[in-house]
Amino acid sequence: MAKCEKGYLCAVCGKEVEDLIDSELYLRYTVGWLDPEKLHIAPERHLMCNPALAQFINDERFSELKVPSEADKQQLDAEFVAKRTELLTRGYRRLVELQQAGESVSITDYPLPEAAARYRLGG
């Protein structure tokens, strides 16, 4: 993360979210679930501290999570799970790319193309 992006504390465990690839906040922003205008006031969490969301990341660099009972993706509609997994996995892979690029990427370039297009249109 850029220096200005460091210091976010996890709303669940209270520890600093040190790396972009651990950030639920930036994953939500990258996939288009968080308005850029709310990025600085939205709560942050480690991805691992939100297993209900993190279970949809399907990447060898991310630890697989088991989620208790009704929140487990195995209990959800297969089409919903497939779409959510595709989106959040792409978002996570984008965070990996961004972290590898270092501070050379503008925050306005973080979102996936379809999210960036929605943000530009104001919706």
Regions found by a protein language model. Give the residues of each.
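Short microdomains enriched in Cys/His and/or Lys/Arg
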Residues: T30-R45, V67-D77
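Short, charged surface segments at domain edges that flank catalytic/cofactor-binding sites
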Residues: M1-K3
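Alpha-helical structural elements
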Residues: I21-E24, R28, I41, P51, ...
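Short recognition patches in nucleic-acid-associated and regulatory proteins
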Residues: E5-K38, D59
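Short metal-binding segments enriched for Cys and/or His
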Residues: P36-E64
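Long, contiguous alpha-helical scaffold regions
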Residues: F62-G123
